[in-house]
Amino acid sequence: MQFTSVFTILAIAMTAAAAPAEVVPRATTIGPNTCSIDDYKPYCCQSMSGPAGSPGLLNLIPVDLSASLGCVVGVIGSQCGASVKCCKDDVTNTGNSFLIINAANCVA
């Protein structure tokens, strides 16, 4: 085989290997047995980070964002692209279906 043939085959193989693949988001289905602890409900949560004592809702209620989760209620059968947390039902509702939950009241 000639050098150009080997080079061409390698170039085509490397191009095919470098082609981007379809990105599929990781999602968890929330089921009826997601939370096996009584009085705990499933929430789809993303952790929030920030300095302790950061201003909270409307800058009136101080919220420690380092110990809070931003969550939405997990509806059975829905998909959660973040992480599903089982939390006690004492949450702060921001009025737009986004909830602030104390992370100490949640289990993984």
Curated annotation (Swiss-Prot):
Keywords: Cell wall biogenesis/degradation, Conidiation, Disulfide bond, Secreted, Signal, Sporulation
One Gene Ontology term from the biological process aspect of the record: cell wall organization
Induction field: Expression is controlled by blue light and by a circadian clock. A positive activating clock element (ACE) is found to reside in a 45-bp region, just upstream from the TATA box. Expression is regulated both developmentally and by light and is abundant in illuminated mycelia and conidiophores but is not detectable or is barely detectable in dark-grown mycelia, mature macroconidia, microconidia, and ascospores.
Listed SMART domains: HYDRO
Pfam families from the UniProt entry: Eas
Effect noted on mutating residue 98 to G: Impairs self-assembly and rodlet formation
Chief site of localization: secreted
InterPro entries, sorted: Hydrophobin, Hydrophobin_CS, Hydrophobin_sf
Annotated GO CC locations: extracellular region; fungal-type cell wall
Reported effect, residue 76 to A: Does not significantly affect self-assembly and rodlet formation
Subcellular location: Secreted; Spore wall
Signal peptide residue numbers: 1-26
Positions of disulphide bridges: 35-86, 44-80, 45-71, 87-106
A molecular function (GO) term: structural constituent of cell wall
Family classification: Belongs to the fungal hydrophobin family.
Function, in words: Aerial growth, conidiation, and dispersal of filamentous fungi in the environment rely upon a capability of their secreting small amphipathic proteins called hydrophobins (HPBs) with low sequence identity. Class I can self-assemble into an outermost layer of rodlet bundles on aerial cell surfaces, conferring cellular hydrophobicity that supports fungal growth, development and dispersal; whereas class II form highly ordered films at water-air interfaces through intermolecular interactions but contribute nothing to the rodlet structure.
Quaternary structure and interacting proteins, as annotated: Self-assembles to form functional amyloid fibrils called rodlets. Self-assembly into fibrillar rodlets occurs spontaneously at hydrophobic:hydrophilic interfaces and the rodlets further associate laterally to form amphipathic monolayers.
UniProt note: domains: the Cys3-Cys4 loop (residies Cys-45 to Cys-71) does not have an integral role in the formation or structure of the rodlets and that the major determinant of the unique properties of these proteins is the amphipathic core structure.
Protein name in UniProt: Class I hydrophobin eas
Source organism: Neurospora crassa (strain ATCC 24698 / 74-OR23-1A / CBS 708.71 / DSM 1257 / FGSC 987)
